[in-house]
Amino acid sequence: MEIYLVRHTSVDIPAGYAYGQTDVPLRPSFEDEAEAVKKNLSGHTFDKVWSSPLTRCTRLAAYCGYPDAEKEDRIKEISFGEWEMKSWDELSSDPRSEAWFNDWINVPAPSGESLQDQYTRVSHFLNEIRESDLQKVCIFAHG
């Protein structure tokens, strides 16, 4: 089985923010970046194409010729919960952040996820694909 993983293009938010599952805008360079991705995918035929439902992924999938890519919640970016769109500096003053910064792999953000939570949901999705009869798939997601 061949799995093509495609990361979304650059987002248009200041550096240093936990944006996770927030549907943030894309940079004005979207078309140039997307054109490079489209060129790399040209000539490939996929048995199935999925996309994270976040616009930064669905827009790229559509640009590359897959406007009907199946939206899959399990491949969303990690959820920072209450910390979505907060700066890392701002988070460092939150008393709950110490436990998270010390063990973000296992400790979830408030009302959000740990890295292990994200890994578990994404791996369940990927295992389903592996167990299918599909030979060549493409997934538009996050990095």
Regions from the language model: what does each represent?
Residues 37, 41, 118-129:
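Generic hydrophobic alpha-helical segments
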Residues 5-9, 140-143:
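Histidine-centered catalytic micro-motifs
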Residues 51-52, 120, 140-141:
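Short beta-strand scaffold positions
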Residues 43, 85, 134-135:
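A glycine-biased structural micro-motif
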Residues 1-2:
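Absolute protein N-terminus
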Residues 6-67:
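Active-site-proximal alpha-helix that buttresses catalytic centers in soluble enzyme cores
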Residues 64-123:
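Phosphate-handling substructures
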Residues 58, 66, 123-143:
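Active-site-adjacent alpha-helix immediately C-terminal to a catalytic or transition-state-stabilizing loop
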